[in-house]
Curated annotation (Swiss-Prot):
Disordered: annotated segments: 133-170
Organism: Methanocaldococcus jannaschii (strain ATCC 43067 / DSM 2661 / JAL-1 / JCM 10045 / NBRC 100440) (Methanococcus jannaschii)
Family, similarity comment: Belongs to the UPF0201 family.
Pfam families in alphabetical order: RNA_binding
Protein's UniProt name: UPF0201 protein MJ1564
Gene3D superfamilies documented for this protein: 3.30.1440.10
Disulfide bonds: none
Compositionally skewed regions (Acidic residues) per UniProt: 133-148
InterPro entries: PAB1135-like, Ribosomal_uL5_dom_sf
Domain of life per record: Archaea
């Protein structure tokens, strides 16, 4: 897995505060400042660690919201989203709709990785605020579905018998 991070620095912003915002979420990121002609500049970087992001999502109890955002931004082998700079500056995760001012994050799966598995690791589903094992949940749901189908067949068979009984009584 590789995480690509980009954040534009507007003329009204302190470039080192923007850098701090990124490092508060991705402390192991290697960042480079790139001067731009029409803008003040942009921080670009990469990391392989999402541990701090995972920790913040759990401590802020926003795993389900994070999961929704990660799934919404998912492509074949990646997911992308924006983080609010001001929130990141104070060490908090807040997903940003503003694509022009936020911190752009793209998480790329390696060839032998599944992006959905990475998303499940970063933001597992919860029930009542408690992380649930999705694999067990999926097995349970499949079992329940199978039982419902069996019950449905029984009802269909009973219905057929009733129809036959009613027609023979004439």
């Amino acid at each position: 897995m590789e995480v690509i991070i980009k954040a534009k620095v507007k003329p009204t912003e302190d470039k080192y505060k923007v850098k701090k915002a990124i490092l508060n979420i991705f402390p192991k990121a290697k960042l480079t400042f790139i001067e731009k002609d029409n803008e003040f500049g942009e921080w670009e970087g990469k990391t392989k660690s999402v541990e701090k992001l995972k920790e913040l999502l759990r401590s802020q109890s926003i795993l389900d919201a994070a999961r929704m955002v990660l799934e919404k931004g998912m492509t074949e082998n990646a997911t992308k989203f924006y983080l609010n700079k001001q929130a990141a500056y104070v060490g908090a995760v807040n997903f940003d709709i503003d694509t022009h001012g936020g911190i752009f994050v793209k998480i790329l799966a390696d060839e032998n990785e599944d992006i959905m598995k990475i998303i499940k690791d970063i933001a597992p589903r919860t029930k009542g605020g408690v992380i649930i094992n999705e694999d067990e949940l999926e097995e349970e749901e499949e079992k329940e579905d199978s039982e419902e189908i069996k019950e449905g067949h029984k009802e269909e068979n009973n219905l057929k018998i009733k129809v036959i009984d009613n027609s023979s009584g004439d």
